[in-house]
From Swiss-Prot:
It comes from Alcaligenes sp. Belongs to the CAPAB/TerDEXZ family. The keyword Cell cycle does not apply. GO terms for biological process: response to tellurium ion. This is Tellurium resistance protein TerD. The keyword Transport does not apply. Keywords: Plasmid, Tellurium resistance. Not known; seems to contribute to the tellurium resistance (Ter) mechanism.
Length: 192
């Protein structure tokens, strides 16, 4: 049975899904009606060390870097429309393969070309992040984002993190007005 999380809520994967080794993180959204400009939202993951920063640029997993160097995190590909039901983009994580010096994996969604297209998360509805046991396709946890993010062009949906040697997932829902560049700057990536 899936755990429904509120903003800030967390769930222990060792208690909820003790045998889970492979995680599918599904992210979804719907674009509200716009002036005709296409909406292209992009999911990404950042592998963070204890200092809250990436160890190097290879720890930024996105549509131009689909797999971490160690193979522990894989982006399944870019969906340029976000149309249809279910997950719009997803990432797969092999928990046992995540390097020991990675404390946290954050999952971010950004709006491509948001400034030029004058788009924000205020024009996005039905946004969610869900964790699925990729071995048996059972949904473990889900967070439906309900915040009004009228100026934000990037959103940290959720994070997997180590706590006392076990993995946990937290629903975050933190918006960034500066888009992907501001997220990258915060976590140690030079996005210029």
């Amino acid at each position: 049975m899936s755990v429904s999380l509120s903003k800030g809520g967390n769930v222990s994967l060792s208690k909820t899904a003790p045998s889970m080794k492979n995680v599918l993180v599904g992210l979804g959204w719907d674009a509200r009606s716009t002036d005709g400009q296409d909406f292209d939202l992009d999911a990404s993951a950042f592998l963070l060390a204890a200092n809250g920063k990436v160890r190097g640029d290879a720890d930024f997993i996105f549509y131009n870097n689909l797999k971490s160097a160690d193979g522990s995190v894989t982006h399944t590909g870019d969906n340029r429309t976000g149309e249809g039901d279910g997950d719009d983009e997803s990432l797969k994580i092999k928990l046992d393969a995540v390097p020991g010096d990675v404390d946290k994996i954050i999952f971010v969604v950004t709006i491509h070309d948001a400034q030029a297209r004058r788009q924000s998360f205020g024009q996005v509805s039905g946004a969610f992040i869900r964790l699925v046991n990729d071995d048996n396709q059972t949904e473990v946890a889900r967070y439906d984002l309900t915040e009004d993010a009228s100026t934000e062009t990037a959103m940290l949906f959720g994070e997997l993190y180590r706590h006392n040697g076990a993995w946990k997932f937290r629903a975050v829902g933190l918006g960034y007005a500066g888009g992907l560049a501001s997220v990258c700057a915060q976590y140690g990536i030079n996005a210029s």
